[in-house]
Regions:
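Sequence contexts marking disulfide-bonded cysteines in secreted/extracellular proteins
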Residues: 1, 64-66, 154-156
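Compositionally biased, proline/threonine/alanine/serine-rich low-complexity intrinsically disordered stretches
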Residues: 1-45
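Secretory pathway targeting signatures of secreted, lumenal, and periplasmic proteins
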Residues: 40-62
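Short strand-coil-strand connectors
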Residues: 55-57, 89-93, 135-136
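Exposed beta-strand and adjacent loop surfaces of beta-rich binding modules
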Residues: 60, 83-85, 129
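Mid-length scaffold segments of soluble, non-membrane domains
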Residues: 65-102
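Internal interaction segment
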Residues: 94, 101-156
């Protein structure tokens, strides 16, 4: 009987190792690291303004009072479509607000609230931080320092 013909040994398949998995995100948004920066406060004739960002740099986020109109404007640096959304997350409240560019060609997105809106109180007293999510921009995780409360209270 003839010996069976050996089958050819298959060529080893070269595979590229998969990319490393992304760094795990915190299980809960409130545990995410704080966005680098500090709050500062500035008083003016129309009320107060709290600004968050790197020292000596452009503000990433602002809470601006218009006392005469009884309104607070939330301003996020960055460009967005003509209409977008800004979601504010606190320990007790999550709310999505309609947002628009702050002006023609503006590098800021804004959302406006009545100065008495309970969302503002939730931002001022949340545990650890509050989050600002704006469509198309990175999420900001901001501490509720005293400047936040000062800007809000300057409108009441």
């Amino acid at each position: 009987t003839p010996a069976p013909t050996p089958s050819p040994t298959p060529e080893p398949v070269q595979t590229t190792p998969p990319p490393p998995p992304p760094a795990p995100s915190a299980e809960n948004w409130i545990d995410e690291p704080r966005t680098p920066g500090d709050w500062s406060y500035r008083a003016d004739m129309s009320g107060g303004e709290a600004l968050y960002g790197p020292r000596g740099g452009e503000a990433l986020f602002a809470i601006k009072c218009d006392r005469r109109a009884g309104r607070i404007t939330l301003l996020r640096s960055g460009r967005a479509a003509s209409s977008t959304s800004m979601t504010i997350r606190t320990e007790t409240v999550d709310r999505t607000l309609a947002a628009t560019p702050a002006g023609s060609g503006s590098q800021q997105v804004m959302a406006t609230l009545a100065a008495s809106d309970p969302l503002l109180d939730a931002m001022a007293v949340t545990r650890g931080r509050f989050a600002v999510e704006t469509t198309g921009l990175s999420t900001l995780y901001l501490p509720p320092w005293a400047e936040v409360t000062r800007a809000i209270e300057s409108c009441r």
